Amino acid sequence: ISAGVFREPINTLTNLGFMIAGLYILYTVSNESSFNDFSGLNKITILYGVTVVYLGPGSMMMHGTNTEWGGWADNLSMVMYIIIPWLYNIYKMSEWSVNTFLKVYISIVIFYAVMRGLFGYGMGIGLDLFGVSIGLWVISEFLYRFWSPSMRFISGFVGFLVLMIFGIFPSEVFENIADYWWIIFFWLPGILAGKKPNGSRTYIWYFAGMTAYIAAWLIWLQGNLTINPDSEFCNPDSLIQAHGIWHILTA
């Protein structure tokens, strides 16, 4: 922890990785021909690239200031990014237009920004929209790959597999259902995905990204003072910060 310009210098500066990644995405799509909704310069690719860039400044505001408003900006940037993949998948499996996709996206972002600002983490209703959106992304990818009328219902149960990866088992969920009421959102993709998507996808980068994210999360746990108070990675003055590594890997 520093008394200088940045309260957490390493954890602040490692956010440059998101900005570099986002700018590279925008550079790449601006130099390629458009062959689907996620190639070439269009409303969706520009939105995606810009939100990746904003992950950097959003997190910088939190780690650089250690303030409540900085935490709000950080959480907002994370939500602005993570809702895009599952909303995009729903767009591809529904009758949504691009403008409908954008209107839904903007509505969710504004709702979260206001509720997070007024009521703090959980928005006063015990909903971690970022965490739930990780599950919705996996669920919607599963449904995209295996879409059928019956899979629209079955896909919701994939959310429990995601929870188990993060150490939360069904027994805990149903014993504390008041805290996990948000599992009902696991069936949201199935409800909205009314048609089989066109085309197919390759998933090598999807699984590579998920692997990097899980590795980053495991490293992040090592630097979490609440979970590992005696860990060498919890030294705030060290140049090697687990949270900084988390930033680099997730970028």
Regions found by a protein language model. Name each.
Residues 1-185, 192-205, 211-251:
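Early transmembrane hairpin module of multi-pass membrane proteins
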